[in-house]
From Swiss-Prot:
Residues 1-88 are cytoplasmic. The gene is Slc3a1. Acts as a chaperone that facilitates biogenesis and trafficking of functional transporter heteromers to the plasma membrane. Associates with SLC7A9 to form a functional transporter complex that mediates the electrogenic exchange between cationic amino acids and neutral amino acids, with a stoichiometry of 1:1. SLC7A9-SLC3A1 transporter has system b(0,+)-like activity with high affinity for extracellular cationic amino acids and L-cystine and lower affinity for intracellular neutral amino acids. The lineage of its organism: Eukaryota, Metazoa, Chordata, Craniata, Vertebrata. InterPro entries: Glyco_hydro_13_cat_dom, Glyco_hydro_b, Glycoside_hydrolase_SF, O16G_dom_2. GO terms for molecular function: metal ion binding; protein heterodimerization activity; protein-containing complex binding. It is a single-pass type II membrane protein. This is Amino acid transporter heavy chain SLC3A1. It comes from Mus musculus.
Length: 685
């Protein structure tokens, strides 16, 4: 019994016959003290057993479960909780639908955003004359890359580089030996790839020349065609002709652009081949589907290299009449054998033939395969020189059939005598004939025409630049025009060139050092202009009144003013001296009024006689005379010197395009209005 009790006592204390209750046993369970101390056994140590604390059972620990379901339902059904909840729910639903509806509405009413080729100027470069990087006297691709910072400082958005393909003609124009090779004088394919990457790193775009009509007579295709080798037999236009004692009798009277017969006898094939240009430039046979596929494959090759677009040159020559009928003489009384100049025939059977536009549209479809990524639209421009305005407009395509984004507008380069009337006629001719919704463009120069300064005179260069940047559409500048470069005199040149176009291809004038800073070589492929000591980039950078500084101001104005890129254009007046027009946009009160004097003497304009509610004074935003910038002019008597131009600005709530008196003289490519409250453009106005 005691043994059992001892087992139950976890702790026992013995002190001189006293027992203390440890609190874990009942008092009655403690045995009584032995009266005989001697009979007590020696105390033995007792083990203390402390049980480990029990781990709480996981199922016993539960989170707070909240209000029971029955109670929750009791409260949630009360009106003071149910009504706010339903209001918030339906407000959320309505807000979501309103947001979706507003987004759809903005998308529907907003006009199409401007593409990159619409949003800024294009700068055309003749690569052999821009900048030499390897000291051989010839410009090259690395030279262009070195000057990209200069180009971006002009607020240029797109570079247009003319032909750089491997060519047998020394002026590297159109006689291409290999469409997939860079001519060594310009560099390597790696140089081109580096240039494309650098251009894109600067946020710029690149378009290049492409000449599908013909090749060099040294092209492998032509060499194979001469020997009737396989599929290349009909890659060119061959026809039987007689050749006796070195004298060729051609199949018909068709003439080359450069004069004389467009047929040349080939000693290998014993037939005549057709060439619209030089005999070294045989025309491809675009009635052969295999030729069209070859050209599309070349287009794909350059697009895969990162090119953003093409200028398709000489496309009106792609097809000729099948039956080889003689073309009609301009002067029917002229002896046929004396007709040798291109202008002496009507070229009804060798240009703009039925099916030509279908080929161009097919090129467009090939390019569209690379235009599907956002911001990667591929541009197509078409060269349409010497075409009537009606034929030129055909390159825009049809309402539902896409073709060129625009044909290049070179009509300013063909003005005979500069005046207010002739400038007005060029503008109205394009704007009145351009299909609805299409985009205009304006060029003042190029490698095939005399330079702007030499055509119109240095005193009108600034006014022409002001015109270029304030007209609606894309301005296109030929290298050197921004500083007023002129033609050079070329005599006794001993290479195979079209000498009439060499005058506008002189080296770019960068500074007043040797060779105008174009090259460190001892010679240049063409002579520099003798005025390069004063007409150069470095000098004009520091002159507030220089052509370069005004060009930069105008390009910046074009880039920052929505009115100039999207607004209405209203022609108000033209005479032998002046052209007056406004640029305005619905929703923006600020209006630009442009006055330009292209006459041979000074003139005075009364603008209030044209616009009755015009303020008595207007502020000059920009002027060809930098000293008058920011000042005010009397609108009843604006005095303009010869070649002077002003960009005036004022505020009005009554834009001219909404007034019946001016409505028929106003044009817009894509109708747009501005909401200042939402800071958006919309088209339903």
């Amino acid at each position: 019994m005691d043994e059992d009790k001892g087992k139950r006592d976890p702790i026992q204390m013995s002190l001189k016959g006293c027992r203390t209750n440890n609190g874990f046993v009942q008092n009655e369970d403690i045995p009584e003290q032995d009266p005989d101390p001697g009979s007590r056994d020696t105390p033995q140590p007792n083990a203390v057993s402390i049980p480990a604390p029990e781990e709480p059972h996981l199922k016993a620990v539960r989170p707070y479960a909240g209000m029971p379901k029955e109670v929750l339902f009791q409260f949630s059904g009360q009106a003071r909780y149910r009504v706010p909840r339903e209001i918030l729910f339906w407000l959320t639903v309505v807000s979501v639908f309103l947001l979706i509806g507003a987004t759809i509405a903005i998308i529907v009413i907003s006009p199409k955003c401007l593409d990159w080729w619409q949003a800024g100027p294009i700068y055309q470069i003749y690569p052999r004359s821009f900048k030499d990087s390897d000291k051989d006297g010839n410009g090259d691709l690395k030279g262009i890359q070195e000057k990209l910072d200069y180009i971006t400082a002009l607020n240029i958005k797109t570079l247009w580089i003319t032909s750089f393909y491997k060519s047998s003609l020394k002026d590297f124009r159109y006689a291409v030996e290999d469409f997939k090779e860079i001519d060594p004088i310009f560099g390597t394919m790696k140089d081109f790839e580096n240039l494309v990457a650098a251009i894109h790193d600067k946020g710029l775009k690149l378009i290049i020349d492409f000449i599908p009509n013909h090749t060099s007579d040294k092209h492998p295709w032509f060499q194979s065609s001469r020997t009737r080798s396989g599929k290349y037999t009909d890659y060119y236009i061959w026809h039987n002709c007689t050749h006796v004692n070195g004298v060729t009798t051609p199949p018909n009277n068709w003439l080359s652009v450069y004069g004389n017969s467009s047929w040349h006898f080939d000693e290998v094939r014993k037939q005549c081949y057709f060439h619209q240009f030089l005999k070294e430039q045989p025309d491809l046979n675009f009635r052969n589907p295999a030729v069209q596929e070859e050209i599309k494959e070349i287009i794909t090759f350059w697009l895969s290299k990162g090119v953003d677009g093409f200028s398709f040159d000489a496309v009106k020559f792609l097809l000729e009449a099948k039956d080889l009928r003689n073309e009609i003489q301009v002067n029917t009384s002229q002896i046929p054998d004396t007709v040798t100049h291109y202008s002496e025939l009507y070229h009804d059977f060798t240009t703009t033939q039925v099916g030509m536009h279908d080929i161009v549209r097919d090129f467009r479809q090939t390019m569209n395969q690379y235009s599907r990524e956002p911001g990667r639209y591929r541009f197509m421009g078409a060269e349409a020189s010497a075409e009537s305005i009606e034929r030129t407009m055909m390159y825009y395509g049809l309402p539902f059939i896409q073709e060129a984004d625009f044909p290049f507008n070179k009509y300013f380069t063909t003005i005979g005598t500069l005046s207010g009337h002739t400038v007005y006629e060029v503008i109205t001719s394009w704007m009145e004939n351009m299909p609805e919704g299409k985009w205009p463009n304006w060029m003042t120069g190029g490698p095939e025409t005399p330079r702007l300064t030499s055509r119109v005179g240095s005193e009108y260069v600034n006014a022409m630049h002001m015109l270029l940047f304030t007209l609606p559409g894309t301005p296109i500048t030929y290298y050197g025009e921004e500083i007023g470069m002129g033609d050079i005199s070329v005599t006794n040149f001993n290479e195979s060139y079209d000498s009439t176009t060499l005058v506008s291809k002189s080296p770019m004038q960068w500074d007043n050092s040797s060779n105008a800073g174009f090259t460190e070589a001892n010679h240049t492929w063409l002579p520099t202009n003798s005025d390069y000591h004063t007409v150069n980039v470095d000098v004009q950078k520091t002159q507030p009144s220089s052509a370069l500084r005004l060009y930069q101001d105008l390009s910046l104005l074009h880039a920052t003013e929505l009115v100039l890129s999207r607004g209405w254009f209203c022609l108000l007046r033209d005479d032998s001296h002046s052209v007056v027009y406004t640029r305005e946009l619905d929703g923006i009160d600020n209006v630009f009024l442009v006055v330009l004097n292209f006459g041979e003497s000074s003139t005075v304009l009364n603008l209030q006689g044209i616009i009755s509610d015009l303020p008595p004074e207007l502020r000059i935003r920009l002027s060809t005379n930098s000293a008058s910038k920011g000042s005010a002019v009397d609108t009843r008597a604006i005095s303009l010197e010869k070649g002077e131009g002003l960009v005036l600005e004022h505020s009005t709530k009554a834009p001219l395009h909404q007034q019946a008196a001016f409505r028929d003289r106003c044009f817009v490519s894509s109708r747009a209005c501005y909401s200042s409250a939402l800071d958006i453009l919309y088209s339903s106005c």
